[in-house]
Amino acid sequence: MEPYAILYVTQEIEYLLKDSFLPKWELDGIKDLNTLWLERGRMACDTYAIGKIEQWSVRQLRAHRFLFISTKRKIRLKDCTISPDIFILKKELKEYDMKRFETLIGRRRVTLRKSFGNMLRAYAFQHVTVLHGSEAETLSYADPKRHVVKGQPKAAPMYDHPDRWWRDVDDGPTDKKLVSMLDYIIYSADEVYYVGCGDLKTLEQFASRDRKRFDRIKWICIDPIAPETSYANVKVVREKVVSARDLKHYLMRDEVERLLIWDVSADGLKGTIEWEKQRFKEDRNGENIAEALCADFALALIKHRIPEESDEYICRSSWLIPQPGAPITMYELRNLMRLDGYSHVERKHIPRAYARKIDAEVARRLVEEYHGEDVGRLLKRSLYEDIHIERADGLTDGDERTRADLFYLTNMRNVAFMHDVYRVVEKSFISTLWVSNRQNFTYDDVPVNRNFITLRFSKKNRRVLDGNGAILFLMWQHPKDFPKTMNYDPSWAENYAVIFYHALTSPVPDLSLCRFIGLRLMSSTLRINSDRAHQVTDILKKLGLDVSGHLFICLMSNSYVADLDWWFRMILEWSVKDREGKLAALSEAKAELIEWRDEKADEPWHIKNDLLAALFEFIYFAKHFDINERYVESWIQYLRNA
């Protein structure tokens, strides 16, 4: 069974649901945890929920995959007040019909996916050095002085490879041209020398957009018209730069990564031959100064105006790239030059700047293909990734530093190398595997069986959880770093298994371990579709013996990712306590439950032999899931030795 969502809507939205074909779940009559769990388990598709939820905590509702939809800015729960995951302005609600409402939900849920990914990256950033399979989101949160961001991003459009130019129908507008330029180029720079900075409005707009990145850079802004500024990290120099000597004496410390931005454009009579020559000279002068100071700068980004009267010309360049946010009438590229100065990032995939002949017609076509004020968002992202992500195949990279492998291992291109994928998971500090069989229109991931992951990867101090469980675990264990009020889509998160290192201080059955939602539904489904699935377990129970139904159905249904080391320790160490002992351990660990039967509280939930019986019975079925019996037998041995 796939992880379907509960779409909770507040009262003022309920009237829309009359036209929905999805089920509607009334919550008002539910009084206890177990009833909530049992009723939730009957739902085998996305379901709307209405009614009172103040008696439940946010983690309990997230465990049931609740998404909160409201026109209210805040929703009150048992333990906190949260912002809705999907907010609708009340004055706009009257314009919605069911189709528009559900379209909005679909679009907003896509944006919520990023929140899940960012939370996993935040945990990774705390513990690892190398991040594989990286995209723009990784760069945006990485510390270039501490983290090595590796991957194989799609090549950005550039002059050299017109055969690889691409367009995307999902593209849209981005920031203004120069703000976009700063956004994609400054990633790892300690010092930026901005020659031709103008009136500093570009810098101010970028500071307003991303103050954290702005503040970590020392800016040297050089332009005769530059005004004074109150920014402590900005030095203004009101001079012209006409030679390398003019710039050299402003270079400050050693062993820092420096970036040169050259955006010099003097006044002239537009359209004249003299103006064309002046523009050409200014751009070549920027290249010459960058080359003369090549030992001081890691990168230079030079203004590159395409001559109107020339078919071919010579420049010094690594890449000629289009400009996100530039008007389609602006026949100007940016010239990226990789130089020899110190850099935090390995950029061997970018050729060292060299003198080269440029075909002006190809350069103009590059402008016409990518410039325009209604496009540029994906171009900027692509440039950002292509310039700053170190090229490496995560499956073969020999870097032995602590690593993270998020959101790429189960891509279609790795399907022939699953042995290497599993080897990477074994050595990675945190990794993800796609486990869902639902249709995925966004990514080309191939699912891995949940029961295989459950049996293969769990061990002491290594957690194996679905993505929702991983987030709930981090909220439980690290509430300051991962507040429980954070917005994310729990059902989307459960499309992934997350395997990560984290010690377990207390083996209590916190709801992050596994929720087993729909377990009884899956058990009934197996029973009515097979004469063999329950045969042996039924006989054992008639003989007065017991089998862990949770464990058996978990493995047989292939619907759940569970941490067996934690689970078995919970049964052997916590479940044997009496009611008071159980509750005391839960209280001390600040854990929360998703199911609890008070009438059984003094009894063990199961004993070792119940777990062994479930594993022995599953061995018969393991071959149907292409699971080697040794992975089951290793857990049988684990229990025998416990």
From Swiss-Prot:
One of its GO terms (cellular component) is viral outer capsid. The keyword Protein transport does not apply. It holds the Pfam family Orbi_VP4. InterPro entries: Orbi_VP4 (IPR007753), Orbi_VP4_C (IPR043026), SAM-dependent_MTases_sf (IPR029063). It comes from the Viruses. It is found in: Virion. The keyword Zinc-finger does not apply. Keywords: Capsid protein, Outer capsid protein, Virion. The VP4 protein is one of the five proteins (with VP1, VP3, VP6 and VP7) which form the inner capsid of the virus. Belongs to the orbivirus VP4 family. This is Core protein VP4. It comes from African horse sickness virus. The lineage of its organism: Viruses, Riboviria, Orthornavirae, Duplornaviricota, Resentoviricetes. The gene is Segment-4.
